[in-house]
């Protein structure tokens, strides 16, 4: 998407969304604690395998990035039926060239002697910056904290764009719908460029996410190689790199599990167990969530030393991983959260609550207290889309799916995504979906906030 289109969208949304004052406006200039309920997130990850290819983030040399093949230091994991792939990398060019291109290939080979069909159930890919017409790209634009999406995708960065495409059920034109691979050798499913020609600085990135279904077991690998600018490496070149077992250099040796002191999470290069977290956010021992419990929050993408005092680590475990890389999928990047809030008003009068995704400072949050600060001037911790079904629309009626793009900074409350008003004894199921995007820093919290009755008529629908 062009810069001008997104900037126009930003201006439009800033005009058409009624201003919602921050709940931090009345606070002091320094950090403050909000006392409330903070519960572990109900539900769990599924067991779908996800190839997590994120180490190195910055690719500095050709070679195999991640391989499940049995030979040449591969992880020896066959993928059969449903599996996913998450790949996120950056390329900073060559010092001696101004127009080099790094190419990424996804290779696969059947275990047996029969051809295999791979269906792309859904997926997308995006560059940080496009250098040619037709390339899906999403620059890191300075978007406002909240933008309501209409018919045009809103994105800031490739991870944000791909996450939004997955929520919308859209697919980048660079991706096929189905791939058939012959036995006996590795075949390229995809070959995608990371170009830097004409960019200043020489820096570009690509995010790729695929949800796949294989008709029979296959081995899969991701490989990086230089091409002749616009000409990708040949099939023979890809196979030679895979067969030789040449490795692209890794980065960030992780702190061993269970160690004390400073923790280096590192990045993932392995096979992750779990691609979707599904849960119903009801009260313990009940099938509904009493809205009188608000404010109440649940962590999203909680991790080691980032559980916000809930003692819950949502991080997906790894079935196996490359030596010297992360030992768990810290951050759950690419994981979809599909959450249901069965809201209920047991009172004899109308009650209104608001839904928000927030980014408290994990360094000062624990034991039912979330630390925030006014001003929204800290580093960006989350940039990406979220989908909510069941918010109030006209006349308080529940709306269908609404999608928003958020840019949240460290210690930022809200902003509110919308409100839910319930009559006495009324219930409503609200659904929240997000794909945890690349370029975010966990954790965040999903929050149900109380709203004064006099303010319950605000509607963010443009």
What are these regions (language model features)?
Residues 8-17:
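Bacterial N-terminal signal peptides
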Residues 20-24:
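Sec/Tat signal peptide C-region and signal peptidase I cleavage site
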Residues 25-27, 61-121, 125-126, 132-136, ...:
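Long compositionally biased, domain-poor regions of proteins
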Residues 26-56, 219-303:
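Activation corresponds to long, low-complexity, non-globular regions
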Residues 35, 43-48, 105, 128-131, ...:
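Large eukaryotic, non-enzymatic subunits of multiprotein complexes that serve as scaffolds/tethers
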Residues 127, 140-201:
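Intrinsically disordered, low-complexity linker/loop segments enriched in Gly/Pro
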Residues 157-178, 249-274, 395-416:
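A broadly tuned preference for mixed-charge, low-complexity surface segments
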């Amino acid at each position: 998407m062009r810069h001008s289109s997104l900037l126009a969208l930003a201006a439009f949304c800033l005009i058409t969304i009624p201003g919602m004052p921050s709940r931090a406006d009345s606070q002091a200039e320094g950090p403050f604690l909000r006392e409330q309920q903070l519960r572990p997130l109900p539900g769990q990850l599924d067991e779908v395998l996800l190839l997590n290819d994120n180490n190195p983030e910055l690719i500095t040399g050709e070679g195999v990035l991640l391989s499940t093949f049995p030979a040449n230091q591969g992880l020896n994991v066959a993928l059969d039926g449903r599996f996913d792939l998450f790949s996120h990398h950056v390329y900073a060019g060559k010092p001696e060239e101004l127009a080099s291109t790094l190419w990424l290939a996804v290779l696969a080979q059947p275990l047996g002697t029969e051809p295999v069909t791979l269906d792309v159930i859904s997926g997308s890919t995006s560059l940080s910056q496009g250098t040619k017409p037709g390339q899906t790209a999403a620059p890191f634009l300075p978007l406002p904290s909240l933008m309501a999406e209409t018919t045009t995708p809103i994105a800031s960065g490739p991870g944000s764009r791909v996450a939004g495409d997955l929520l919308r059920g859209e697919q980048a034109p660079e991706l096929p719908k189905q791939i058939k691979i012959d036995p006996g050798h590795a075949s390229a499913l995809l070959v995608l460029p990371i170009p830097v020609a004409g960019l200043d600085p020489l820096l570009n990135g690509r995010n790729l996410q695929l949800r796949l279904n294989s008709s029979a077991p296959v081995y899969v690998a991701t490989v990086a190689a230089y091409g002749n600018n616009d000409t990708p490496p040949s099939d023979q070149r890809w196979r030679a790199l895979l067969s030789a077992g040449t490795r692209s250099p890794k980065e960030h040796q992780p702190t061993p599990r269970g160690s004390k002191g400073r923790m280096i999470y590192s990045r993932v290069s392995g096979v992750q167990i779990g691609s979707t977290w599904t849960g119903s956010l009801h009260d313990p021992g009940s099938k509904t969530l009493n809205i009188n419990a608000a404010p109440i929050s649940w962590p999203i993408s909680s991790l080691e030393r980032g559980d916000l005092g809930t003692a819950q680590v949502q991080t997906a475990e790894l079935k196996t991983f490359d030596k010297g890389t992360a030992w768990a999928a810290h951050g759950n990047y690419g994981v979809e959260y599909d959450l249901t809030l069965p809201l209920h008003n047991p009172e004899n009068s109308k009650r209104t609550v608001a839904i928000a995704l927030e980014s408290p400072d994990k360094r000062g949050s624990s034991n039912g207290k979330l630390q925030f600060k006014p001003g929204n001037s800290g580093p960006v911790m989350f940039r990406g889309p979220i989908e909510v079904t069941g918010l109030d629309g006209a006349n308080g009626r529940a709306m269908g799916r609404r999608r928003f793009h958020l840019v949240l900074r460290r210690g930022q409350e809200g902003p509110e995504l919308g409100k839910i008003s319930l009559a006495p004894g009324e219930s409503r199921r609200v659904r929240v979906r997000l794909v945890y995007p690349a370029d975010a820093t966990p954790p965040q919290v999903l929050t149900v906030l109380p709203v004064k009755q006099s303010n319950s008529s605000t509607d963010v629908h443009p």
